[in-house]
A protein has these predicted regions:
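Short, solvent-exposed loop/turn elements at beta->coil junctions and helix N-caps
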Residues: 29-33
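A short catalytic or substrate-binding loop motif that flags glycine-/basic-rich loops and adjacent residues
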Residues: 35-37
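Conserved AdoMet/S-adenosylmethionine-binding subsite of the radical SAM
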Residues: 106-108, 118-269
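Conserved Radical SAM active-site core
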Residues: 2-28, 40-41, 50-153
């Protein structure tokens, strides 16, 4: 979070357990940006990243190894618990429907994010394993790590900048493989005039003209400090559980006094 994470490469996962992923958190919500904005979404946040962006507001250094079967079992309960914890029945529209092959998919989008999800070599096997579990699948990647993403998965490439002393210097261009495969690009935008995040880079405009694919933008949130609830949790707990990482770590109180830089966020938005 805020550039304090450990930086790792694909070698970190070279001895990964078979048919398993290193998972930080899992939660159900509405997708707020990109090609599936407004759609119900099951988020799986994978652990570790090859970058350390100073504005990043998510934790992804801690995690648990989970088998593909364990991930989908937890996904099922996460989706159902979203409504059950509100004292409501799970709506029929999202539940799997019976068909000739058994049960169909959940009517929601699987969003795999991080960290940098493409660091984990087992991810492609999981996406193929779970192809019929969700109506749509999306990966969000910074574009600097190569993997062959299956065609049934929407690849959202969200490029980030190199930094020096916590200040953005220039965009890191996605690899040729990822840029060719990407279904869309997504950029975080800042109102700071001298920041690279103030504009969509020229190469992205050229990519859009050549491919006809979409570019999405979203505002950068600027914080004055770490969220208090997260600081307390990490200070008091010897080890953070999946449930804790999937709730407190993922739900930041925007009403916490002094947390957000309101002036900068107003101009960014």
């Amino acid at each position: 979070m805020f550039g304090t994470n450990e930086i790792v490469g694909q070698k970190y996962f070279k001895d990964a357990p078979k048919d398993s992923l290193f998972v930080t958190s899992m939660f159900f919500t509405l997708q707020g940006e990109g090609p599936y904005a407004g759609k119900p979404a099951l988020f799986i946040r994978l652990t570790k990243c090859n970058l350390a962006c100073s504005f990043c507001d998510t934790f992804f250094d801690d995690g648990d190894w989970m088998t593909f079967e364990e991930i989908n079992s937890r996904a099922y309960h996460t989706i159902c618990d979203y409504w059950n914890k509100q004292g409501k029945d799970v709506p029929e529209w999202i539940l799997p429907k019976s068909n000739l092959d058994g049960l169909g998919p959940f009517d929601c989008v699987l969003v795999v994010t991080g960290g940098e999800p493409l660091l984990q070599k087992n991810l492609m096997d999981y996406l193929n394993y779970s192809k019929n579990f969700f109506t749509a699948m999306q990966i969000e990647s910074n574009g600097t790590v190569n993997q062959d993403v299956p065609e049934h998965v929407t690849l959202v490439c969200s490029p980030k900048c190199s930094e020096k002393n916590g200040v953005a210097v220039k965009y890191l261009a996605p690899t040729e493989l990822i840029l060719k495969r990407a279904d869309c690009l997504k950029f975080v935008m800042s109102s700071e005039a001298d920041s690279p995040y103030n504009n969509v880079p020229d190469w992205a405009h050229e990519w859009k003209q050549e491919t006809g694919k979409e570019i999405y933008v979203s505002p950068m949130n600027v914080y004055n400090t770490f969220p208090q609830k997260i600081k307390i949790l990490h200070a008091e707990s010897g080890s953070i559980t999946m449930d804790q990482r999937s709730t407190v770590d993922e739900v930041i109180s925007f009403w916490e006094p002094g947390l957000l830089n309101l002036a900068e966020n107003q101009t960014n938005h």
